[in-house]
């Protein structure tokens, strides 16, 4: 077996991608040091603390996240890594069937089968039994899905989701578009279906509804463990805050295995020399063999380009032209990214309990939308305070307070909660990249020894936790 040349690696950014890269690099025999400018791990999927913390009307303090994330059973790499760092998946995640049901119980709900013995059987049953769908709706969807499956869930890179559905024969009906395709597209790609990549959408659909089950190992105590299975289409909703779902356990695991996690250490400059990469942070100056940039694309683009061009000046002249072209290509791909916001409106209604932990809502889109939220989560059923709800507005538009007011009116009407009141509205302005047709996403490598990971990096998934983790795995493979 070939031995691994141990490298000293700096990882800039302590979000999900950065922490995943640190864990996987350590598993591969390297030494990892994570630099995080803030005092909180998790990036765009973390707990909100400090001056941004909130309370209920009676003064009860709340633990809120900066967004409402979900996983699915097909997110095999994320689930595997969570187990590696000691997270008990059954305690940390609420498993439920893929559900896009509305408060009136119409819409799609797959059966509550932990792991269907025939791939896609639960999806077929869910479509057959969908309330309010006519046989015309169901047959059109069956035929479209059958065609996508025969085509290997592949299509032209330049098709939008709307074009894909309109070209299906027969065309997918308006009801199925409104109650399945659009909400699924927004929740997975955070991009309206008229602008969303059909190829990426098909990949998500394939993995969620037509992929093998995920086997997971549950450690009950020091002496007892058992295996269980998640169906690929199972929704896995966090029942603890997002920082404690993976980033904090990953940090503890990393330190235990000899790595470093440096909070409050803003990297001010990185320079390349024959000795390696000199990382200059707030209170730390250290040389590394490799640097992995794991922050947001906008921040990493600025830093990465400056670092790469500076490094090229210290590389042999015969390589200079080639490297400059590679760096320019990487910069162009980052510049081509557009970003979409996600708003989370936390609201409270004393005694409120939804019919299930997550419901779809009747919504419209655009700056004039009167019903902007697509989903609502009952935090009381997810380990939080009873009566606390989280409304999610993907690809949100407009002023924070105007958006909040519209969501509260929408919630009062659609959930029949006349006393619903706002608690806090959090908008991540650059929550995801716009997953558009033909988009060429940045590569994992800017220059030799200068790598990148994050959910925006080239890969099969949209901007999801699984996309972030898989980009980290790919970056570590390049070490």
Predicted regions and their residues:
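Conserved Rossmann-like nucleotide-cofactor binding loop
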Residues: 17, 40, 298
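Glycine-rich FAD pyrophosphate-binding loop
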Residues: 26-52
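Mid-domain catalytic core of redox enzymes
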Residues: 28, 265-402, 410-414
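Conserved flavin/dinucleotide-binding core of flavoenzymes
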Residues: 111, 370-479
């Amino acid at each position: 077996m070939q031995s691994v040349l141990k490298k000293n690696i700096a990882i800039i950014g302590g979000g999900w991608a950065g922490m995943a890269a640190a864990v996987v690099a350590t598993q591969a025999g390297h030494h990892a040091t994570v630099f995080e400018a803030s005092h909180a791990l998790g990036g765009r999927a973390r707990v909100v603390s400090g001056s941004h913390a909130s309370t209920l009307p009676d003064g009860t303090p709340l633990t809120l996240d900066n967004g409402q994330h979900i996983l699915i059973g097909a997110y095999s790499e994320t689930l595997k890594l969570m187990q590696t760092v000691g997270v008990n998946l059954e305690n940390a995640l609420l498993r439920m069937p893929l559900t896009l049901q509305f408060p009136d119980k119409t819409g799609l709900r797959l059966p509550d089968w932990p792991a269907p013995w025939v791939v896609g059987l639960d999806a077929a049953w869910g479509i057959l039994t969908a309330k309010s769908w006519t046989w015309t709706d169901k047959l059109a969807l069956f035929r479209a899905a059958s065609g996508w499956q025969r085509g290997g869930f592949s299509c032209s890179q330049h098709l939008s989701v709307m074009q894909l559905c309109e070209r299906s024969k027969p065309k997918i009906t308006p009801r199925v578009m409104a109650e399945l395709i659009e909400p699924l597209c927004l929740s997975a790609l955070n991009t309206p279906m008229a602008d969303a990549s059909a190829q990426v959408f098909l990949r998500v659909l394939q993995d969620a509804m037509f992929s093998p089950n995920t086997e997971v190992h549950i450690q009950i105590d020091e002496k007892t463990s058992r295996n269980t299975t998640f169906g690929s289409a199972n929704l896995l909703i966090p029942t603890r805050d997002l920082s404690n779902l993976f980033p904090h356990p990953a940090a503890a695991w990393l330190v235990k295995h000899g790595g470093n996690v440096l909070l409050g250490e803003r990297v001010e400059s990185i320079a390349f020399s024959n000795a390696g990469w000199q990382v200059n942070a707030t209170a730390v100056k250290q040389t590394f063999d490799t640097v992995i940039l794991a922050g947001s694309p906008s921040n990493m683009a600025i830093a990465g380009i400056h670092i790469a061009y500076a490094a090229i000046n210290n590389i042999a002249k015969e390589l200079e032209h080639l490297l400059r072209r590679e760096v320019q290509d990487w910069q162009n791909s980052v510049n081509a990214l557009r970003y979409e916001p996600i708003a989370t409106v936390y609201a409270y209604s004393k005694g409120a309990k939804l019919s299930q932990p997550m419901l779809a809502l009747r919504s419209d889109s655009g700056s004039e939308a009167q019903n902007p939220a697509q989903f609502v989560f009952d935090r009381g059923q997810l380990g939080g305070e009873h009566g606390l709800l989280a409304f999610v507005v993907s690809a949100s538009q407009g002023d924070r307070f105007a958006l909040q007011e519209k969501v509260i009116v929408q919630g009062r009407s659609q959930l029949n909660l006349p006393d619903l009141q706002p608690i806090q509205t959090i908008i991540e302005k650059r929550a995801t990249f716009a997953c558009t047709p033909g988009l060429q996403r940045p590569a994992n490598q800017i220059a030799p020894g200068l790598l990148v990971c994050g959910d925006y990096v080239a890969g099969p998934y949209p901007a999801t936790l699984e996309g972030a983790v898989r980009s980290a795995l790919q970056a570590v493979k390049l070490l």
